[in-house]
Regions:
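Aromatic-rich, lipid-facing transmembrane alpha helices and their immediate juxtamembrane interface loops
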Residues: 2-330
């Protein structure tokens, strides 16, 4: 039902978008891409959850690439921004950065509307650091609570828990304009955002791969066992501490990455984490297929069965319990 609704909305928006392309309304085209890109991402995630990894994702992937290309090329202000950025790189990009750094404004939103500049460089490093420190905090919390160490990583390789990385990015983006607001508003907003994100993540993992990584059934304000009042409270506290205390200090730390290597280092790290994420999704899909009794005849499935077999997956993802019968695939 949800997938059908998203497809219906996306199709209607795509029709309007096509008319705008024909009429060459560049400014409106650029604005509509802000709506179409999230819809396309939602369509792709729902398709992955309900049908798994396959040719069903080719359409959303191509559409996403086209939308991003149109977004960048259709908006005259973005073209002007690219020209300006190119000129700055040629003339005085470094001096401009050093000037901003000397005023304590490196990485900041210079418009004053938000605290942090929501550019790729900042958001990527917030994601990466959130993945690592989120894993550390959760591991310590589990050890204190149960007196045992448990590997709570969410990627095939590295000390990464992507739910915290994405959580950090989502909270940062949605609360960026509230950084000067009172603590109660930030706390409540973060609690709702975190709870909704946790619910969706739990639903997606179960629908796509039959995996439950947590179950809060029986807790206060439990919603299908996917989130609860207790953990929404934790999200609220973490969001408040993040916006008021951690983000300003972390931004200053990120901006200390040397100018000469910051973009090359970011690109290399992004590629490594992106490959890690894609391989993780493929390994989870192969794990689901094996547990569901699907024949592993393709070279790809045989590769994952050899190098990322059931024992490896169970040991690596110790918090995950897989039951293909609970998946929502069609």
């Amino acid at each position: 039902m949800v997938h059908a609704a998203v497809l219906l909305v996306a199709t209607a928006c795509l029709a309007v978008f096509g008319v705008m392309l024909i009429m060459n309304k560049r400014r409106h085209i650029a604005q509509w891409t802000y709506l179409m890109i999230p819809l396309t991402l939602a369509e792709g995630l729902l398709s992955l959850a309900l049908q798994g990894l396959g040719v069903n994702l080719i359409g959303p992937a191509i559409q996403l690439v086209v939308l991003i290309a149109l977004h960048v090329t259709a908006d005259p202000s973005l073209r002007e921004e690219r020209r300006l950025q190119f000129a700055l790189r040629r003339m005085d990009a470094r001096s401009a950065y050093e000037d901003a750094a000397s005023q304590g404004m490196a990485g900041r939103d210079l418009t004053g509307k938000g605290y942090i500049s929501l550019d790729f460089f900042n958001l990527f490093w917030l994601f990466a650091i959130g993945c690592v420190f989120g894993l550390v905090i959760e591991t310590i919390y589990h050890f204190i609570l149960f007196g045992e160490y448990q590997d709570r990583a969410g990627f095939l390789w590295g000390p990464f828990s992507p739910i915290y990385g994405f959580g950090v990015v989502i909270v940062t983006v949605l609360l960026n304009h509230l950084w000067q607001s009172n603590w109660l508003l930030i706390f409540c907003s973060s609690a709702v955002i975190g709870g909704a994100f946790e619910y969706f993540t739990s639903w997606f993992m179960q629908a796509a791969f039959g995996i439950r990584a947590w179950d809060y059934t029986g807790q206060w304000l439990s919603i299908d066992g996917r989130t609860s009042g207790k953990y929404m409270f934790f999200w609220g506290v973490l969001g408040l501490v993040w916006v008021k205390l951690i983000l300003p200090r972390l931004l200053r730390l990120i901006q200390r990455i040397p100018w000469k290597i910051r973009y090359s280092l970011t690109l290399v790290c992004f590629i490594l984490i992106f490959v890690d994420g894609v391989m993780t999704l493929m390994a989870l899909d192969a794990w689901y297929s094996r547990m569901a009794g699907v024949a592993q005849n393709s070279p790809v499935s045989q590769f994952f069965a050899t190098y990322f077999n059931d024992d490896f997956m169970a040991h690596r993802f110790q918090t995950m319990k897989i039951d293909p019968s609970t998946a929502g695939r069609m």
